[in-house]
Amino acid sequence: MAKIVIIGAGAMGTAFALPCLDNNHDINIVGTHLENDFIEELKNSNNLHPGLNTQIPQEIKIFKFEKFEELLKSNVDLIVLGISSKGIEWVSDQLSKLYKSTKIPKLLMLTKGLSVYNNQYELLVDKLERLLAEREIKKVDISAVGGPCLAT
């Protein structure tokens, strides 16, 4: 059983958690700094996720941002990035603060899209790798999901 932390409590990150649970992994979802109110509403609605119209099983633990550092420092096997494309810089800052002196766990990026860097298109997974390297986090094992995406 792998210990997986998903960053982002939106539809994509939460939808990804369900098959992970089906495969007997230990799943923790931690919201970003922008999702505390959303997570509170989720807990008040008996874990009914409004974006998925699905009841999230109690075995999937959902935390507010205040638990971010604690969860990511707890022998994680895989960090899943279920954040928007606008959050790539933010998450690279957060990860580089936490893993400055230790090896970063494997990353799986659910975020898809392109950005522009030096007047050329750049895949978001390449952007993340570049931003982490600029912050002294090198030799990162990053995988990315491809294809169309609707988390419903």
Language-model regions: role of each:
Residues 59-60, 96:
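Flexible domain-boundary/linker segments
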Residues 74, 78-152:
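Rossmann-like NAD(P)(H) cofactor-binding subdomain of soluble oxidoreductases
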Residues 1-54, 60-65, 70, 117:
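NAD(P)+-binding Rossmann beta1-loop-alpha1 motif at the extreme N-terminus of oxidoreductases
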